[in-house]
Amino acid sequence: MGFKTKFKRYFNLDDHVEEVERYVEEPEQRDERPALEKGRAPKEKQTAGMEQNQNIVSLQSVQKSAKMILLEPRSYDEAQDIADHLKRRKAVVINLLRIEQEQALRIVDFLSGTVYAIGGDIQKIGPGIFLCTPDNVEITGSISDWVTRQTDSTV
């Protein structure tokens, strides 16, 4: 068994389809159990059945929705379009090098508020370049230190 096969089995990514057994409840038969036992048993069966159905998650639907948008706004008016992409849960990389510094600052302020409102994140990834992400995208690490060191060593 190769590494790839073990990996797929661990994360349940095998191509085979698992058969799920469904239990059909039979009509209740009258028996002489005390009232407390009768009341608890059907609820426990129902709860166990619901827990099995709630544990199934489709990973393919999560993977298809990830998109990243690259934008280079020319004016502050385009900030709302960028915010709309974030509201649709798409990550956005914004290049502000071709816009006046005052307007670039206003765009960053606007997007900072947008990102805060949706629970996302904004990070500077280079001079005049920002990454804005919604709450479904996690940013790990930092390349700003690396960019700073590279520009210091070349100057």
Swiss-Prot record:
Region span, Disordered: 22-54
Principal subcellular localization: cytoplasm
Similarity comment: Belongs to the SepF family.
Protein name: Cell division protein SepF
Description of how the protein assembles with itself and partners: Homodimer. Interacts with FtsZ.
Extent of Basic and acidic residues compositional bias: 22-46
Record organism: Shouchella clausii (strain KSM-K16)
InterPro entries hit by this protein: Cell_div_SepF, Cell_div_SepF/SepF-rel, SepF-like_sf
Entry's localization field: Cytoplasm
GO cellular component terms, semicolon-separated: cytoplasm
Entries under Gene3D superfamilies matching the protein: SepF-like protein
Function: Cell division protein that is part of the divisome complex and is recruited early to the Z-ring. Probably stimulates Z-ring formation, perhaps through the cross-linking of FtsZ protofilaments. Its function overlaps with FtsA.
GO BP annotations, alphabetical order: division septum assembly; FtsZ-dependent cytokinesis
Keyword annotations from UniProtKB, A to Z: Cell cycle, Cell division, Cytoplasm, Septation
HAMAP family: SepF
